[in-house]
Amino acid sequence: MSANIKPLIKEDFKHSFSSASKFVKNPSEWICHYGLGLRSPSNAAMTRGNLAEFGTYYKIKRGMNGKDGKAFSKLIEHRFKKLKFLNADNEIKNAIDIAVHFEKILYERQLRDIKSYQREEIKKVEGLKYPVRMFTDFEFENLIVDAKSTLRLPSTPKIDHIRQQGLYSKLYEKPTALMYATPKKSLFYELTDDDVNIGFNEALNHFKSLENYIIRCNNSLEEAIKITPLYTDPNPFAWDHNIKQEAEKIWQKVMKK
C-alpha cells in the first residue's frame, strides 16, 4: 500500500466481539469508530455498568455480603467522582442496587472465589488472519459470568449476548453464563452446548465477513468510505451529534473525489 494512502486498520488490529457486532449492524459506524477514531463519549448506561460491576467485585472480594451498605454506598460515590463520569449522577443509586442483586446471584450459586476480574485475553483462532481480543467480567474456577446492568430486564437473554458468551466459552474452554440485573429484578442464564456452538460459529462468520471487507477495500480507508453508505439513523446506533457531523463532512469530501 502506498505511503500516502491511510489504512482502514493498523497492522496490530485485533478482532473483538463488539467490533464485529458493530460492523454487522452498521459498517459506516464501524469505519467511524475503528478507521477514523471517532469515539462516542461515555454514557449513563456505561457509567451504571462500570460502577455496578466494580461494586460487585469489591463486595465479594471483601466478604461484605449482608453487611451495612453505608460504606459500600460511599465507595461507589467515591469511584464515580474519581473517574469523573459526566451527567450520570442518578446512576449511582441504580449501580448500588444492581450490585446488590449481582452479589446475591453469585452467592446463591456458591460463586465467591473470583479468579479474575475484567481480564484481557488475546487468542489466535484457526481460519482468521487477526487474533481475537476478549475481556471477561467475572471468572471463577469452572465458570465465566458476564454481568449486564440494565433498567429493563429482558424476559430472555439477548441473542448478541449469547453469541458473545458462546465465543468466549469456546476460546476459554470453560462454561459461561449471563447475569442480568435492574435495581429491582435479576435473571441468571447458563449457556447450553447448543448456545455455545451456534454462538461461536456465528461470531466466527462475522469475523470472517469483516476480514473479507478489509480485503475488498485493500485496507484503504478511502476505498472503504467509497463503497460504504453513511447511515446515521438513530437505529440501530444512537449517533453522537459531533461524530455525525464530522462523519458527514468526511464522506462528502471523499465522494467528491
At which residue positions do the language-model features occur?
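Metal-dependent nuclease catalytic cores that hydrolyze phosphodiester bonds in DNA/RNA
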Residues: 1-135, 247, 255
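Residue-level recognition of conserved beta-strand positions in structured domain cores
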Residues: 34, 146-149, 180
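A generic structural signal for short coil/turn motifs at secondary-structure boundaries
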Residues: 40-42, 152-156, 188
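Flexible, glycine- and charge-enriched loops at secondary-structure boundaries
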Residues: 45, 154-158, 193-196, 200
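Short active-site loop/helix that positions an aromatic residue
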Residues: 61, 170-171
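Glutamine-centric residue-chemistry signal
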Residues: 118, 164-166
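Non-catalytic protein-protein interaction segments used by genome-maintenance enzymes to assemble
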Residues: 123-164, 171
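Metal-dependent nuclease catalytic regions and adjoining charged, substrate-binding loops involved
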Residues: 172-257
